[in-house]
Amino acid sequence: MKRRTFLHTLNWSIASATLYHGAGNAMSLTAILDSNIREKELSYHRIQEIKYSTVQMKYPRLVGKNARLDLHGYGPNVEICGIKTDKGAMGWASLRGSRKDAEQIEKELLGKKVSELFAPNIGILNDRHIAFDIALHDLAGVILEKPVYELLGRDKPYTTDYYSGMIYFDDLEPSEKPAGIDRILEECRYDYGVGYRQLKLKIGRGHKWMPFKEGLQRDIDVTNAVAQAFPDCGILVDGNNGFTVDQFTQYLKGIPSVNLFWIEEPFHETVADYQKLRNYIKAAGIRTLLADGEADPNPALLKELFEKKLLDVHLTDIEGLGFTNWRRLMPELEKVGAQASPHAWGSLLKSYYTAHLAGGLANTVTIEGVTSTSDDVDLSGYKIQDGKLIPPSTAGFGMPLLKKI
């Protein structure tokens, strides 16, 4: 596909921001040649077949409640698609949305050159194909024999911190004989052994599962206990919108010696409430990051909150927003001094996709970890070193399927 054709399919401002760098918005000759070579390689391949399946991810333990939701279980059965070309290349990834939605548009991909659907320095070229967004990134990496982070511009990936997102209200389980805070500390020790040096604690027990005062005190006690037991770890907290702003300041008053790395979703975001929280933490001398945008994100409101410096970290889900859309969003966040940490809960696959997004584009303050094993996917290429997640240098996302689809 000619360069002018795929540029025409994009919003010009996004295309120019992605394709052009440096003084005078001029691409280097090397970049132009590399782009042309990659496009030619992708044009040799046509989409021949799309297949669907699932992969089972297994958590190392039962994951319990959060402020709003009941037990999260032992791991999801993730819907995936595999995209095969007429030259025998195959890429795969989680579906964005349902299989039914994907099947309704798959005919728009069949028979097309990969270069008609995907450009390495852009991502997918038609938003209608977002169901296959991540799989097309993997496929392009396989064809070009490059890891996805290299498609995004880095020979060696940026690396960033990696936190355990596995610490829920497991002190409340089993319901007939709750294990108490010792269970939380046991889980933190396990996660520390995995390699995490950041631990995210779910809080908000008084929203639904305990009387408010009792739940608030348990949140405070858990936070203080974990911070004391793991002094070399960053502590993050996530309220899942289970507080009011006044209730949340009560929580902060109960943990004066804990230096929180970030505060996530203490309440459903509004300008007034985040202004009140920002004013409080500033007056109290609390240095922490405010992170939001996961649950039912309102893009216009989030934009306002970031522009007003009321939020620091954007959390919208890596699959929900889409990999290509995250590529578009990242420079916009940088313009307002904000950082990213795409929501990845549920599937370790999403953590690993995020490692490539962060590896190629940086500006990612930490990555959500969802500790898992799988008999269906080879996850061994990814490593945790010094508390950071290191993606592999193999093609695509570097996760070979161990099952046929």
Task: Describe each model-derived feature in a short phrase.
Residues N259, T270-A395:
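Shared catalytic-loop signature of beta/alpha-barrel
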Residues G88, E145, I263, L305, ...:
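Conserved, mostly hydrophobic/aromatic
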Residues D133-P174:
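Glycine-rich, aromatic-flanked loop segments that form ligand/cofactor-binding clefts
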